[in-house]
């Protein structure tokens, strides 16, 4: 389990722009996502600039190959010193910093159901005493546009009240499909869709419901044929259960040159529907066992 930054931690970007952590609101395979408010210096102290909330993403990956931890200073480092682990962390940070360009291209395509990135930094200053003392950490951070009117993650929304009708759940899935379609039409695959990085706002009982996507750390550009280039040795992040079989094949090395397409995102949405309908989480192995059982019983025959 990753150790997240606690509430009231200050994160200061190069140039002096400073944010106060208000709590963790989501997580993906490549990092943690916090709710934050902007603070400004007033005399010897920092004060809240306004009531707007932003999303801060911190590079803190989960990997099958390497383990990472947070030092007392707040910096994310490999658990065991190795050049390979350090290179992996640098690669993930670089991918996160490239999110700005990707989300900008998607947003410029008239996509409205995503939260674009406003600021990026390969290192920041952190304060654990409300801005009295800061120190540098080599943690990559990005600031996403204001979270005002963007609601809450599906994870939070779903846990608040278990009394959801089929119609409400299917409306959320429909809105998620609309959001993912915008990404696909803009020429990208998301590849890390899960309940923690899909935000829902409005009422699930009427037309006001809208879903927004964030965390494009795993996103890949689609080529002319609609597929992305082979991932190769680059990290690819996806969450357990939501991970399409073809992504599993890439991660295990069974099909390293497989080219991913839109169906990988659709698989993740299918798993989201399963989770919302049952309230249960299924591992990749559990889903594979169900599939094999279905095939063995003859359920797949027409």
Name each model-derived stretch:
Residues 1-16, 20-23:
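Juxta-kinase regulatory segment immediately upstream of eukaryotic protein kinase catalytic domains
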Residues 22-28, 33:
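Protein kinase glycine-rich loop
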């Amino acid at each position: 389990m990753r150790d997240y930054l606690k509430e009231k931690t200050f994160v200061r970007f190069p140039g002096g722009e400073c944010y106060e952590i208000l709590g963790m609101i989501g997580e993906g395979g490549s990092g943690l996502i916090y709710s934050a408010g902007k603070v400004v210096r007033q005399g010897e102290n920092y004060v809240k600039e306004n009531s707007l909330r932003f999303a801060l993403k911190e590079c803190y990956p989960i990997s099958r190959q390497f383990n990472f931890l947070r030092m007392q200073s707040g910096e994310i480092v490999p658990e065991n010193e190795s050049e390979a682990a350090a290179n992996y962390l640098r690669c993930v940070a670089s991918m996160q910093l490239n999110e700005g360009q990707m989300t900008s291209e998607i947003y410029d395509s008239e996509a409205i159901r995503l939260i674009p990135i406003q600021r990026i930094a390969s290192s920041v200053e952190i304060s654990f005493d409300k801005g009295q003392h800061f120190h540098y950490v080599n943690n990559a951070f990005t600031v996403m546009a204001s979270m005002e009117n963007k609601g809450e993650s599906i994870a939070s929304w779903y846990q608040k009240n278990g009394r959801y009708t089929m119609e409400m759940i299917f409306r959320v899935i429909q809105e998620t499909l609309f959001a993912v379609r915008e990404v696909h039409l803009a020429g990208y695959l998301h590849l890390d869709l899960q309940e923690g990085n899909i935000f829902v706002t409005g009422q699930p009982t009427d037309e006001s419901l809208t879903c927004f996507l964030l965390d494009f750390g795993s996103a890949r550009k689609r080529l002319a044929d609609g597929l992305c280039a082979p991932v190769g040795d680059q990290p690819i992040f996806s969450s357990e259960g939501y991970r399409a079989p073809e992504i599993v094949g890439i991660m295990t090395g069974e099909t390293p040159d497989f080219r991913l397409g839109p169906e990988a995102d659709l698989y993740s949405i299918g798993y989201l529907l399963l989770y919302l309908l049952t309230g249960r989480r299924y591992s990749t192995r559990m889903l594979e066992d169900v599939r094999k059982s279905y095939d063995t019983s003859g359920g797949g025959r027409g």
